[in-house]
Amino acid sequence: MRIAVKLAFHEDAALRLLNWLAQENALLLRAQPDLPLLYDSGVFYRRELDETWCDYLNMLAQGHEDCDGLAAARAGELIARGWTALRPGDDGFAEAQRARPARIRAEVMLTTRSEPDNPGLYHCIVRYPL
């Protein structure tokens, strides 16, 4: 099924939608524990001309995503799978190995060099405390 939503850009609204997608991805990953983690999936980065945000299943089928979809996927797997989603070299890996949290409170964040109230190029990242 395809659902298109057209919005006037607002940073807070974009973050709410991306974090909603991360939560949906977490639900999918909990319901289907055999799904591969993002770094094991073969999915790669590809810049999009039009923004299409896929859930985890559609991202796997498509085989690629840009930073927004990849960030929502990564946040979703940290939320769903906790410490087992971290790999050596990831921030907080050693601490997560010791604490073994079942869930990590991950969220999608936006970074930009644009001035306030002047949308420009944004990049999505994942932030998570341990």
Model-inferred region functions:
Residues 1-130:
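A structural boundary/capping signal
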